[in-house]
């Protein structure tokens, strides 16, 4: 939440240079509060598991958040009961005429599938295009980050020879950027993907602010200048055993997956994994909600426009 101080307090300018949200008394007197509206487009097969993971992170904020769940189409799901989808998920036709403060697009197990071969690719493009004029800030996670970069920057799909799986060290590059508020200089986060996000490639072909990278995993966190698009190439939402379950699944399917890096104590899958990224995940989502959504979104979403975004005074 912002701190409220007298309009002319000298500390205000110093704090603003560090991108700390300072609210003047003049602005505070005019402010009204309402719940944030966040839409989650859940592309993962196990939707109940995934929605729980994201809701857990969204809940760790002093802001009131009203969440709605969106499905990409009406095809039957092999992993989620139809009753659950019918009761709790919206179709795009039900929300397309409304505006939202935030949109989260989850990952999807499509790392080796070309974009044009994804059965719902055209529909996903429609939703991402719709978000430009109906959503204040969109958070793209893992495969969705790759899809978003394709649609926004026309970046081709780049794939690693071996799947990236494990918990990797990352370092931050713009310590005063709002999304990095409170981050340690180095932090851990899980990855599970084939996509390759080279820092040099993204720096050359986009105007993104690259906020965090890993020597092994490449770019982890990047945003557009206006913070309306935030890309997370890993899985900060993962539960402690998610990587383990994926590893066991791949073994059961006759594959030869590598043991997830920096995950099991002594690299022994018989040892229960330790979740070393939980605090990072909560902080990342709290910062996204606060700095990319709450501080930028218009109070009256029915009159959404880029000009209506909150500006610092």
Curated annotation (Swiss-Prot):
Location within or outside the cell: Cytoplasm
Catalytic activity: L-homoserine + succinyl-CoA = O-succinyl-L-homoserine + CoA
Catalytic activity, EC: 2.3.1.46
Stored Pfam families: HTS
Physiological role: Transfers a succinyl group from succinyl-CoA to L-homoserine, forming succinyl-L-homoserine.
Marked site (Important for substrate specificity) residue numbers: 192
GO molecular-function terms, A-Z: homoserine O-acetyltransferase activity; homoserine O-succinyltransferase activity
InterPro entries registered for this protein in UniProt: Class_I_gatase-like, HST_MetA, MetA_family
Keywords: Acyltransferase, Amino-acid biosynthesis, Cytoplasm, Methionine biosynthesis, Transferase
Active site (UniProt): 142 (acyl-thioester intermediate), 235 (proton acceptor), 237
NCBIfam families attached to this UniProt entry: metA
Principal location class: cytoplasm
Record CDD domains: GATase1_HTS
Name the UniProt record assigns to this protein: Homoserine O-succinyltransferase
One of the protein's GO biological processes: L-methionine biosynthetic process from homoserine via O-succinyl-L-homoserine and cystathionine
Residues bound to substrate: 163, 192, 249
Top EC class for this record: transferase
Residues of the site described as Important for acyl-CoA specificity: 111
Claim: Acyltransferase is one of the keywords in the record: yes
Pathway(s) served: Amino-acid biosynthesis; L-methionine biosynthesis via de novo pathway; O-succinyl-L-homoserine from L-homoserine: step 1/1
Family per record: Belongs to the MetA family.
One GO term describing the cellular component: cytoplasm
């Amino acid at each position: 939440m912002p701190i409220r101080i007298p309009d002319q307090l000298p500390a205000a300018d110093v704090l603003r240079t560090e991108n700390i949200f300072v609210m003047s008394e003049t602005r505070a007197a005019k402010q009204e509060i309402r719940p944030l509206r966040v839409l989650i487009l859940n592309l993962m097969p196990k939707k109940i598991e995934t929605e729980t993971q994201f809701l857990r992170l969204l809940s760790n904020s002093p802001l009131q958040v009203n969440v709605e769940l969106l499905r990409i189409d009406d095809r039957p799901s092999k992993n989620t009961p139809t009753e659950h989808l019918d009761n709790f998920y919206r179709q795009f036709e039900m929300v397309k005429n409304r505006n939202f403060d935030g949109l989260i697009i989850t990952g999807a197990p499509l790392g080796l599938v070309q974009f044009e071969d994804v059965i719902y690719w055209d529909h996903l493009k429609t939703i991402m295009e719709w978000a430009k004029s109906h959503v204040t800030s969109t958070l793209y996670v893992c495969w969705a980050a790759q899809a978003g970069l394709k649609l926004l920057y026309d970046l081709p799909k780049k794939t690693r020879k071996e799947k990236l799986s494990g918990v990797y060290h990352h370092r931050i590059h713009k310590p005063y950027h709002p999304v990095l508020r409170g981050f340690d200089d180095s932090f851990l986060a899980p990855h599970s993907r084939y996509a390759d996000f080279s820092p040099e490639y993204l720096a050359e072909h986009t105007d993104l602010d690259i906020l965090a990278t890993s020597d092994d995993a490449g770019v982890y966190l990047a945003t557009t200048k206006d913070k309306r698009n935030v890309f997370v190439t890993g899985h900060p939402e993962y539960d402690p055993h998610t990587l383990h379950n994926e590893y066991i699944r791949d073994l059961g399917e006759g594959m030869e997956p590598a043991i997830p890096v920096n995950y099991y104590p002594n690299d022994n899958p018989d040892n229960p994994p330790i979740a070393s990224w939980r605090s990072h995940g909560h902080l990342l989502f709290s910062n996204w909600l606060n700095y990319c959504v709450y501080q930028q979104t218009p109070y009256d979403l029915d009159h959404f426009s880029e000009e209506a975004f909150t500006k610092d005074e």
